[in-house]
Amino acid sequence: MKKFIFLHIIFLLSSFSFFSQVEFNAKLSKNSLGLNERVKIEFSVDKDGDNFTPPSFENFRIVGGPSQSIRNSWVNGKRSYSKTYSYFLSPIKKGSFVIGQASIEVNGKIYKTSPININITASIDKPVDI
């Protein structure tokens, strides 16, 4: 009987990883840049999703992207998956701005990233991209 209960507990604990929460986030290559620089923004999700919708990128010009990369691996029977959407942006004007939420659908449910703050300063002498 103890073995039976123990096996059920192990089965339940291992099944929680199958139903784990979806992680969908946004990441900037830098949070502050000059008006003549570019920034890379990546939106990554750890489950296979569809219908990705980027933010409007208000106050920015898209100079590259979107590009998409997928990483899928199995190590010791455990699956690791990541899908990333990347854009290169060039600011249009100086100021502090918020890059809005992106969204993606995973298993019929919509997930959104958190908005990101970014600061655009005057043009700099030697721009350092990305």
Language-model regions, residue ranges each:
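GIY-YIG nuclease catalytic motif and its immediate N-terminal context
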Residues: M1
